Design a protein with these regions (language model features):
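Bacterial N-terminal signal peptides that target proteins for export
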Residues: 1-9
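C-terminal motif of bacterial Sec signal peptides marking the signal peptidase cleavage site
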Residues: 16-19
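Bacterial signal peptide processing site
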Residues: 21-23
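Contiguous beta-strand segments within globular domains
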Residues: 31-52, 57
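Short, solvent-exposed, Trp/other aromatic-anchored flexible loops in extracytoplasmic proteins
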Residues: 84-121
Length: 168
């Protein structure tokens, strides 16, 4: 009788402890997303920031698929997630043809080291600037930020034109 009571009590305690442990619905949460326009380098990129909300298995990777403003296939970025990182930033390669007030989508997949999907996030980017505000060529070159002679001509004129060929 006493043995049965001990087993029943332990089983009940085990069930209660298991019920108290919350299974994490998400491991990552989007904390910010924006376009970064860098006039000095004549570049535009997507920047997505996330915070870790639960432990992520070692060897996990983020696979981000950014909509390509020029059209065509998405821009794909693979980035390893390190266990000590509480905040994670993902930045795309340089973009061309970003249009003001047009929504652009990104899909972020968190996969483990075996490629198993752990979580999928979606976000929408919208720029309050058109990429035509950027020059086609960087304003500066080199480590000393020297004026770019292709933009700042020897005769005193400047060429800030944007020569991107974008779909209408």
């Amino acid at each position: 009788m006493k043995r049965r009571l001990v087993i029943t009590t332990l089983a009940a305690a085990g069930i209660m402890l298991a019920a108290c442990q919350r299974q994490a619905e998400t491991m990552l949460e989007v904390t910010g997303h924006l376009f970064v326009f860098n006039y000095r380098n004549a570049s535009a990129t997507y920047l997505l920031t996330m915070k870790k909300t639960a432990p992520i298995p070692d060897g996990s990777t983020i696979v981000a698929e950014f909509e390509n403003p020029q059209g065509g296939t998405p821009l794909v970025l693979n980035q390893k997630v390190f266990p000590m990182d509480d905040k994670i930033s993902v930045q795309s390669e340089n973009l061309h043809c970003v249009v003001k007030d047009r929504p652009y989508s990104v899909t972020v997949k968190l996969v483990d080291k075996d490629g198993k999907l752990l979580q999928e996030l979606k976000a929408q980017f919208k720029s309050d600037l058109d990429q035509t505000v950027l020059p086609s060529k960087p304003l500066v070159v080199g480590a000393g930020y020297e004026r770019n002679p292709e933009v700042f001509k020897p005769d005193g004129t400047t060429d800030f034109s944007n020569t991107d060929k974008c779909p209408a």
